[in-house]
């Protein structure tokens, strides 16, 4: 079994294929209904090979959630770093959270989040991932605010409190966006989030993304 993964590069590629497959199945069926056999079939692998890489179903699924979040942040970092102003960077971050048409947007991620929250009270491994993701979100927002304050773009608000408030607001839009609530679509969620952010931080937001 040791040789089935092939070279180190092939092993990494195969592992990522399985993680992608796991994410697709979780989005389609939900975390509780995702089985190793489903993931193996989607990845074009045997169940034994999936077990070789991940040992257990829970480990496979928690690693898939972690992999999804890491990939999202890689895209977010690249897009944010390409923008010069802190206000523009914060707008890009919120757009990626709310607008699924954005590259790396969170449409499928929201469905994963619904499962993440549902499983957290009953699964310590999932709860630990949720906590780390929450901390990462807040730290990203906090850093953007502090950088903007140093540049004179943002008002002198408490960056930690703002990060908690904005992340909670974005979390609040998860359910209606994920469930396609006609009263709170992605563009509306983006607009309301940016109204809150610009009002608290004292910068102008023209809402151009919401109308694109």
Where are each of the predicted segments found?
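N-terminal intrinsically disordered/low-complexity leader segments
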Residues: 1-13, 205-212
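Residues in soluble alpha-helical coiled-coils and helical-bundle/repeat scaffolds
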Residues: 5, 55-59, 81-85, 121, ...
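Helix-turn-helix
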Residues: 17, 21-63
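Short coil/turn segments at alpha/beta junctions that flank glycine-rich nucleotide-binding fingerprints
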Residues: 28-32, 83, 151
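Hydrophobic alpha-helical connector segments
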Residues: 63, 74-110, 162-166, 190, ...
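Short, basic, alpha-helical segments at the C-terminal edge of helix-turn-helix-like DNA-binding modules
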Residues: 66-72
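Amphipathic alpha-helical segments used for helix-helix packing
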Residues: 89, 104-128
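Hydrophobic/aromatic-rich alpha-helical bundle segments in the mid-to-C-terminal region
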Residues: 125-131, 135, 149-197, 201-212
């Amino acid at each position: 079994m040791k040789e089935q993964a092939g070279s180190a590069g092939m092993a990494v590629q195969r592992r990522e294929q399985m993680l992608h497959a796991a994410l697709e199945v979780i989005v389609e069926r939900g975390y509780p209904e995702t089985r190793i056999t489903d993931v193996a079939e989607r990845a074009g692998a045997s169940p034994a090979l999936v077990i070789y890489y991940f040992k257990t179903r829970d480990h496979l699924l928690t690693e898939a959630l972690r992999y999804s979040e890491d990939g999202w942040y890689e895209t977010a970092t690249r897009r944010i770093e390409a923008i010069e102003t802190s206000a523009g960077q914060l707008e890009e971050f919120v757009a990626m959270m709310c607008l699924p048409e954005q590259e790396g947007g969170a449409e499928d991620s929201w469905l994963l989040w619904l499962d993440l929250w549902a499983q957290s009270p009953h699964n310590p491994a999932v709860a630990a991932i949720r906590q780390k993701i929450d901390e990462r979100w807040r730290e990203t927002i906090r850093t953007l605010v502090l950088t903007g304050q140093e540049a004179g773009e943002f008002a002198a608000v408490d960056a930690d409190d703002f990060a908690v408030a904005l992340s909670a607001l974005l979390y609040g839009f998860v359910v209606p966006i994920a469930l396609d609530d006609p009263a709170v679509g992605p563009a509306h969620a983006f607009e309301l989030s940016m109204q809150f952010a610009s009002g608290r931080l004292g910068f102008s937001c023209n809402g151009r993304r919401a109308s694109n």
